[in-house]
């Protein structure tokens, strides 16, 4: 038992001794390496791009000088072009009064182990000097700064065969000059020898590419808009609006937002108005006396509400609707066919001073009237008008007169048909001597019959033979 105990003690003692020797050797080795680094650079040490790993401090100057000799910076340009800037042409020199010594003075030799796994890169702004005027001239003389400029272009869209397709972006060759100057100076001072102008964003690039997410969103929106189909109905006639016209109204801005040109939409609606509005047109009218006259001017007829229809059409396009509709009107006639007057109307013959009222094609009432005095500048207007409204009992006022009437039916401003109880006779030549201020005076029975059978919007046709 004693022998075994002695053997175990000896084993443990030898083991501990071995461990101590190993630790001591490691410490000694670490210290010896640290001693080496008291005048040498650490592993992975680079200063302004020059590799000084494990180099003696005293050799660093020469190594940096040697690296500077024959220095040139290669510019990798778009479309495979390359150019060079040499140290010689810009007066590149080693700066004798640089702050280089600060790097190795700050180096702690005992901390060398960190350099095994960590890069020790340094940049000194004062390591080199160059002639700024020469560098500026060299930069300004670069071919990439003087080529014909091809501006970058975003993706764009082309309408072809009823649909839009994407036209790829153009990168162009437009240099961002200040950016290029900054990068060249930085690369020279860093000792870099290769400058890729594309990778360092020295070109003015398009904002949106074929691969951009918004590109497809915009194309889908364009195709949605041109899928719109609007059939406008004008009685028996129609107008069809579709993508063949709408595509000319669409614009895509620099942010790839789709704009509908409101002015173009307004022009389209205006053209519809010019073609289909009938207010003030010349109408052929078959009179009660058997003649056919031309009725000119007036306020009766169809009139498109251009502002309202423009707004409605813009909304239809934005929703890509397929729709059949009438335009929005400020006023409508009774019919789109023929002269649009239909078979319910009031007819007033100024020359004969006579009025007829037809309802659903039947003569309801007729009689002599008195119209405006033309000799005093108060002639009743001629043309096609319509009843604005009717009023039971009204007081009519004007310069030098004020009268009460039982039936008031205006058709143009303050002109209207009404009864005139102060008159004892109608028709003939009365209107030329004692005519009205423009209104149509009718006997009580005639005014009453018209009033009881007429509604607003009914045509009132006034003419001279």
Kindly give the residue locations of the regions a language model identified.
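Surface-exposed, secretory/extracytoplasmic low-complexity segments enriched in Ser/Thr/Asn/Gly/Pro
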Residues: 2-403, 407, 454-456, 461-465
């Amino acid at each position: 038992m004693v022998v075994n105990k002695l053997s175990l003690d000896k084993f443990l003692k030898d083991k501990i001794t071995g461990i101590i020797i190993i630790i001591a050797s490691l410490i000694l080795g670490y210290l010896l390496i640290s001693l080496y680094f008291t005048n040498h650079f650490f592993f992975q040490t680079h200063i302004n791009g020059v590799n000084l790993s494990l180099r003696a401090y005293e050799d660093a100057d020469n190594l940096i000088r040697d690296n500077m000799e024959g220095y040139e910076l290669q510019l990798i340009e778009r479309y495979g072009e390359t150019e060079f800037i040499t140290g010689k042409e810009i007066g590149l020199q080693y700066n004798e009064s640089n702050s280089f010594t600060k790097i190795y003075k700050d180096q702690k030799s005992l901390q060398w182990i960190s350099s095994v796994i960590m890069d020790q890169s340094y940049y000194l702004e004062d390591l080199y000097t160059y002639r700024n005027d020469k560098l500026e001239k060299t930069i300004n003389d670069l071919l990439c700064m003087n080529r014909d400029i091809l501006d970058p272009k975003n993706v764009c869209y082309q309408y072809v065969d009823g649909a839009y397709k994407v036209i790829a972006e153009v990168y162009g060759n437009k240099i961002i000059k200040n950016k290029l100057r900054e990068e060249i100076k930085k690369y020279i001072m860093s000792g870099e020898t290769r400058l890729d102008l594309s990778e360092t964003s020295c070109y003015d690039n398009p904002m949106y590419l074929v691969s951009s997410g918004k590109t497809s969103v915009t194309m889908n929106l364009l195709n949605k808009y041109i899928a719109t189909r609007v059939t406008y109905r004008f009685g028996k006639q129609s107008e069809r609006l579709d993508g063949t016209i709408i595509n000319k109204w669409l614009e895509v801005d620099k942010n790839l937002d789709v704009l509908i040109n409101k002015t173009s939409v307004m022009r389209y609606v205006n053209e519809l108005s010019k073609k289909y509005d009938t207010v003030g047109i010349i109408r052929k009218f078959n009179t009660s006396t058997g003649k056919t006259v031309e009725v000119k001017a007036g306020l009766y007829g169809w009139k498109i509400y251009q502002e309202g229809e423009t707004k409605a059409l813009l909304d239809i396009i934005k929703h890509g609707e397929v729709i059949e509709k009438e335009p929005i009107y400020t006023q409508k006639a009774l019919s789109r066919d023929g002269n649009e007057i239909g078979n319910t109307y009031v007819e007033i013959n100024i020359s004969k001073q006579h009025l007829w009222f037809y309802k659903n094609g039947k003569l309801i009432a007729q009689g002599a009237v008195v119209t405006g005095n033309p000799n005093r500048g108060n002639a009743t207007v001629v043309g096609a008008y319509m009843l604005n409204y009717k009023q039971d009992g009204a007081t009519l006022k004007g310069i030098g007169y004020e009268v009460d009437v039982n039936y008031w039916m205006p058709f143009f401003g303050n002109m209207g048909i009404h009864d005139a109880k102060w008159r004892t006779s109608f028709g003939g030549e009365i209107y030329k001597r004692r005519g009205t201020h423009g209104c149509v005076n009718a006997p009580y029975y005639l005014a009453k019959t018209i009033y009881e059978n007429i509604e607003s919007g009914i045509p009132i046709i006034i003419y001279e033979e």
